Amino acid sequence: LCVIAIHLIYDLGFFIGLDLHLPAWYVFIQQYGGVIFVILSGCCATLGSRSFRRGCIVFACGLLISLVTFGMYRLGMASRDVIVWFGVLHLLGVCMMLYPVYRRLPTPALAAIGIILVVAGYLIAGTVVRAKFLFPLGLLYEGFTSSDYFPLLPHLGWYMLGTVLGRTVY
């Protein structure tokens, strides 16, 4: 529901031009909602099966979003920065596909790896490299834009910490 509320308020401001005084909860959800969503997704990974298969489907949906937004740009319906290069669906798809690889790790080891990935992600944030193919990891090239961007570092770490939470709570 928070995602719907955030997008509704954004759309009202963007398309209709309403100047809304944003409540504190909106700012909090806007800034931290993505991380909360990824953690909850990791938590849910511990409850289901066929994670790799579901990950392929989610990743394919992310690719479809990329294709549609790229088409909008190429047809002149939107600017280049509307293209989604590695959004939340790409991220969650990759995380789900990787879950079977580390599922059997002990919970403390998984927590340690998750923390390391989160810290590494924040340490490399904003790093500019020449290689254009490294953006899914969080290493950006000059001029990179994406309307939805969730790099693997730090978000794979947040997903792993979500699986730790899922194991602990459930």
Regions found by a protein language model. Give the residues of each.
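Alpha-helical transmembrane segments and their immediate juxtamembrane cytosolic regions
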Residues: 1-170
